[in-house]
Amino acid sequence: MATLCIGSAPIYQNACIHNFRLQRPRRFISKSMTKTMPDANPLDLRRRSGNYQPSSWDHSYLLSIENKYVNEKEVITRHVLKKKVKKMLEEVETKSRLEKLELIDDLQKLGVSYHFEQEINNILTNFHLENGKNIWKCDKEEDLHATALEFRLLRQHGFGVSEDIFDVIIDKIESNTFKSDNITSIITLYEASYLSTKSDTKLHKVIRPFATEQIRNFVDDESETYNIMLREMAIHALEIPYHWRMRRLETRWYIDAYEKKHDMNLFLAEFAKIDFNIVQTAHQEDVKYVSCWWKETGLGSQLHFVRDRIVENYFWTVGMIYEPQFGYIRRIVAIVAALITVIDDIYDIYGTPEELELFTAMVQNWDINRLDELPEYMKLCFLTLFNEINAMGCDVLKCKNIDVIPYFKKSWADLCKAYLVEAKWYKGGYKPSVEEYMQNAWISISAPTMLIHFYCAFSGQISVQILESLVQQQQDVVRCSATVLRLANDLATSPDELARGDVLKSVQCYMHETGVSEEEARTHVQQMISHTWDEMNYEARTAARSSSLLSRRFVETAMNLARMSQCMYQHGDGHGCPDKAKIVDRVQTLLVDPIPLD
């Protein structure tokens, strides 16, 4: 099995990194690294424990997983089916407006649109050019499904579309003259409302509340149980809107749902299932790689107090960028996420105030010659961080001729300083305001650190201007992504974290600041998430313009990180207690279990 760990060629984006981790820069090794356990002394009596459960994933088991349905025959079949779908898109002019839109929507939800990005963009561009900046106003209930779907798809792809297209429908809603029993149209309208920006008052105040109420009434109406598929779609939409969902998990759900549709396309369904299995195989190779890396570091085995969550750390990256050709990027970001998890646990749980000051200074100075100033358990952590980040920087320098290590260093230093602020708040019993808490918490949630490493790994040509804006925390889309991640985390984890000893989270800060109940505070935080999505939608539209510094793919990945947070924390602390929060089941579904092929 060793060949799976070392010899398997990673799936990579750039040819020059094909030997990633096979030839590495010289590593620094501490003399005491062969056995690095936390110091056994009376000081340990003052240390806290997170009481985290062990990993749900055995390393040997991970090395053994494979998709039995992926073979040369299926790869050839996918190629043939892909050509058929491509032909459908090329001959789309013979289809109606609604048929074109539904085909694009199906391709996206089935997870295969990445094969046809140019064709899809051409179709949507034609829609936009034909209609002008404002689509015709929808004045008939029977046109609502097509108009709402077009609105959502165009906005999702960065085209400017005004909410005014719904003015006639809004007038009917407000005058109680809207008449339609087509729940499909209402669900489509509901989903479209989540592409709103902060200036879209009609979507916020009229359309979303109306559509939500209509869907709830449909779900609650026992006489509607005859249409099981529509009922499932309605419940699914109310649970989390499509725009906020983790794309890959949605794909797995929709493949099953699509086959139940009366008008489903047989070869499109087959194409989606085969493609899912092939992509899953790429993800399985990634998991084997990062699991071997984690085992080699000894962080999980030697630092008993940290969360052993390498699979969950990798799972985050599938939510960020799932396409098979980006395996190198997923592996890099998974390693970054694993290091973040370890360091977070040191600051949150184990480190003393004095030790945390030392570690923060060490990361800020990035001086390996001062390693002996750290306690033994911190040496292993810092040395691993030092080696991995320098190796990543070396890869970028070789491939892209730019030294990004100073930017990486600053990002990690800022993260550790944010962790230290929270540790001091907890130690001193300080209760920050919501504003003060969030100014620090959007950094301490680690999204800026993850995204700067993503940017350097992904970008073919790295811009110093963008790097500077990222490390200076000037990119609003990063702040928005981090804010959603922080608030989703707070809603799911704050009770457990407070019980074991941690700084107040946004819910408790708002309760303390305003005197409201916990239920009211949680509602307020949920509203903060919704408002932040509006900001992020605006940033995504801005990024679609040619003058934008950030690529659309970077912005989409930042949004995907926010989506992933709502998946990970939907049912509780998916990172700390993955089995209780249904994350183990979701990992099993996406990374282990293939889709059976007839």
From Swiss-Prot:
Pathway: Secondary metabolite biosynthesis; terpenoid biosynthesis
GO biological process, one term: monoterpene biosynthetic process
Cofactor: Mg(2+); Mn(2+)
EC number: 4.2.3.15
Keywords: Chloroplast, Lyase, Magnesium, Manganese, Metal-binding, Plastid, Transit peptide
InterPro entries: Isoprenoid_synthase_dom_sf, Terpene_cyclase-like_1_C, Terpene_cyclase_plant_C1, Terpene_synth_N, Terpene_synth_N_sf, Terpene_synthase-like, Terpene_synthase_metal-bd, Terpenoid_cyclase/PrenylTrfase
Domain of life: Eukaryota
Name this protein carries in UniProt: Beta-myrcene/(E)-beta-ocimene synthase 2, chloroplastic
Organism this protein belongs to: Arabidopsis thaliana
